[in-house]
Amino acid sequence: MSTPAKRRLMRDFKRMQQDAPSGVSASPLPDNVMSWNAVIIGPADTPFEDGTFRLILQFDEQYPNKPPSVKFISEMFHPNVYASGELCLDILQNRWSPTYDVSSILTSIQSLLNDPNISSPANVEAANLYKDHRSQYIKRVRETVENSWNEDDEDEDEDEDEDIDDAE
């Protein structure tokens, strides 16, 4: 049965397919339009450049009146990302508006990468390094960028293992 939330998510998906912003992609799981996989590519000329950061977006039937829960599944060292991968982003909490769609959520997260809000950090260590020891912060971020590449390799290895199992 189609609900208002599911219809809206399908519109969001069509919009992402037709006019995805640079450096972001997202799609619903094949069997559940309420759960999406997303990827944000680290913006150029930032410490996150060339990183491939994966996220999960979980919507409920109150979308778009209620924001989704968004969580990085890639390792992320950032002042506004908790160790669990959950984000501290105003548009996903007190500044949410039903006018936001999947595309605008992801572009907001992408811009947050290089412009953290250090006044209310989710990761105090990252915020302190960002404020007081920028070169150490950049080094830690670059490590997460390199780790994001390894995650891609692990996925390919898993796919190859499945192909081998299928062939046997």
From Swiss-Prot:
Pfam families: UQ_con. Keywords: ATP-binding, Chromatin regulator, Cytoplasm, DNA damage, DNA repair, Nucleotide-binding, Nucleus, Sporulation, Transcription, Transcription regulation, Transferase, Ubl conjugation pathway. InterPro entries: Ub_conjugating_enzyme, UBQ-conjugat_E2_core, UBQ-conjugating_AS, UBQ-conjugating_enzyme/RWD. One of its GO terms (molecular function) is single-stranded DNA helicase activity. It catalyses: S-ubiquitinyl-[E1 ubiquitin-activating enzyme]-L-cysteine + [E2 ubiquitin-conjugating enzyme]-L-cysteine = [E1 ubiquitin-activating enzyme]-L-cysteine + S-ubiquitinyl-[E2 ubiquitin-conjugating enzyme]-L-cysteine. SMART domains: UBCc. Residues 149-168 have a biased composition (Acidic residues). Its EC number is 2.3.2.23. Gene3D superfamilies: Ubiquitin Conjugating Enzyme. Pathway: Protein modification; protein ubiquitination. The keyword Nucleotide-binding applies. The keyword Nucleus applies. Residues 4-150 form the UBC core domain. Catalyzes the covalent attachment of ubiquitin to other proteins. Plays a role in transcription regulation by catalyzing the monoubiquitination of histone H2B to form H2BK123ub1. H2BK123ub1 gives a specific tag for epigenetic transcriptional activation and is also a prerequisite for H3K4me and H3K79me formation. Also involved in postreplication repair of UV-damaged DNA, in N-end rule-dependent protein degradation and in sporulation. This is Ubiquitin-conjugating enzyme E2 2. It comes from Debaryomyces hansenii (strain ATCC 36239 / CBS 767 / BCRC 21394 / JCM 1990 / NBRC 0083 / IGC 2968) (Yeast).
